């Protein structure tokens, strides 16, 4: 029987939940013996049979964004944890009957991969909300969740985790490919071939998060179609100031979040209009992407960049990145043929966590120490188990 795993993902854009039912024909290979098998065959090595996006109601999104900015007290944070658990269970409901297992990333509201003495923080920490027991109770399925802490306990940054699934599903011999995610935060996975020890991945900086903040100031959920940015002009002094941010000088492995990339922490003239602010944020995001490739990936040899995430549907942002990366080809999941298997810019992250959950069920290590900086790989994810596992996972 073909394993079927339902991945649930709500990213740093906090716009809603992607539920992707990942089918894995041919997994696990015969005789894998509990050790992750060598990759073979064409890509992708899986397909998304069904996908449902459930948007957050405005009041839930506002609460999530407030938690990201440390704007909730302990009682409100506890309420939000259960509210998100209910939302995840509801998002899973249409597809759960077809799944053997559910893998839930949860909603990251705080991620501090390194101690910060300036704030009196002496240890790394991360927090993903969304009570898993609610998902298990309402779907009747085993659930794997809370993937990041195991890597951090092993000395890693707890991110990025998606690159393990990128490697398993998309790595191809003879092709030096990067998969770039433009979610709330921008990150890349560099796949130089089939060897997982050569995979490189890191956060490059903001993705959609600054643009979403500008859009919110304009009374919009996002800069739909990049129209706000297209109506403005880049403010060169502000762009230069932002590009001097010390976070951009940190070499990989590195992870970042909205707590770093927010307008509240970036200087700008008080009279800068919203269209110009959007244009500047777009140019800044594109430059941080291009600079990351130029410094840390292109020197190793790179054939193409395949873009995913909500930012892939922003024409202004995509055009700015394409121009900044030139002459490197920038392609979409549709253009490389993966969308025909249901793997699109919208489903990639949910499918990735579905695969991480599947690997956890197999007992495989599902992290890449080179990308997170951990001392060793771990089998990440916490279980909420039913009395017995489905046949396809046992």
From Swiss-Prot:
It catalyses: 1,6-anhydro-N-acetyl-beta-muramate + ATP + H2O = N-acetyl-D-muramate 6-phosphate + ADP + H(+). Transmembrane segments: none annotated. SUPFAM superfamilies: Actin-like ATPase domain. It comes from the Bacteria. One of its GO terms (molecular function) is kinase activity. GO terms for biological process: 1,6-anhydro-N-acetyl-beta-muramic acid catabolic process; amino sugar metabolic process; peptidoglycan turnover. Keywords: ATP-binding, Carbohydrate metabolism, Kinase, Nucleotide-binding, Plasmid, Transferase. Pathway: Amino-sugar metabolism; 1,6-anhydro-N-acetylmuramate degradation; Cell wall biogenesis; peptidoglycan recycling. ATP binds at residues 11-18. NCBIfam families: PRK09585.3-5. Belongs to the anhydro-N-acetylmuramic acid kinase family. This is Anhydro-N-acetylmuramic acid kinase. It comes from Deinococcus geothermalis (strain DSM 11300 / CIP 105573 / AG-3a). The gene is anmK.
């Amino acid at each position: 029987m073909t394993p079927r795993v339902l991945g649930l993902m709500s990213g740093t854009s906090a716009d809603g939940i992607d539920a992707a039912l990942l089918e894995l024909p041919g997994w696990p290979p015969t005789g894998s013996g509990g050790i992750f098998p060598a990759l073979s065959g064409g890509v992708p090595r899986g397909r998304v049979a069904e996908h449902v996006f459930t948007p957050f109601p405005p009041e839930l999104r506002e609460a999530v964004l407030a938690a990201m900015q440390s704007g909730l007290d302990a009682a409100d944070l506890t309420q939000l944890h259960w509210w998100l658990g209910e939302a995840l269970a509801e998002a899973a409901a249409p597809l759960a009957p077809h799944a053997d297992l559910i893998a839930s990333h949860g909603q990251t509201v705080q991620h501090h991969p390194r101690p910060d003495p300036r704030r009196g923080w002496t240890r790394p920490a991360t927090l993903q909300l969304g009570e898993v027991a609610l998902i298990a109770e309402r779907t009747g399925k085993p659930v794997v969740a809370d993937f990041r802490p195991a890597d951090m306990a092993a000395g890693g940054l707890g991110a990025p985790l998606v690159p393990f699934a990128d490697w398993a599903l998309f790595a191809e011999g003879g092709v030096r490919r990067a998969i770039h995610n433009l979610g709330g935060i921008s990150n890349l996975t560099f796949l130089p071939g089939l060897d997982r020890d050569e995979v490189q991945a890191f956060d490059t900086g903001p993705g959609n998060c600054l643009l979403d903040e500008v859009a919110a100031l304009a009374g919009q959920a996002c800069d739909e179609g990049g129209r706000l940015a297209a109506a403005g002009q880049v403010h060169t002094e502000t762009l230069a100031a932002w590009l001097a941010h010390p976070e951009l000088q940190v070499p990989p492995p590195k992870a970042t979040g909205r707590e770093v990339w927010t307008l509240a922490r970036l200087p700008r003239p008080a009279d800068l209009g919203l269209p110009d602010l959007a244009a500047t944020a777009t140019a800044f995001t594109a430059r941080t992407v291009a600079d990351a490739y130029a410094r840390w990936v292109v020197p190793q040899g790179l054939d193409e960049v395949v873009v995913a995430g909500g930012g892939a549907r922003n024409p202004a942002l995509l055009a700015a990145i394409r121009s900044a990366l030139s002459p490197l080809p920038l392609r979409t999941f549709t253009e490389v043929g993966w969308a025909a298997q249901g793997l699109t810019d919208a489903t990639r992250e949910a499918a990735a966590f579905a695969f991480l959950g599947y690997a956890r069920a197999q007992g495989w290590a599902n992290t890449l120490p080179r990308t997170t900086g951990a001392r060793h790989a771990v089998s990440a994810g916490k279980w909420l188990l039913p009395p017995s596992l489905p046949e396809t996972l046992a």
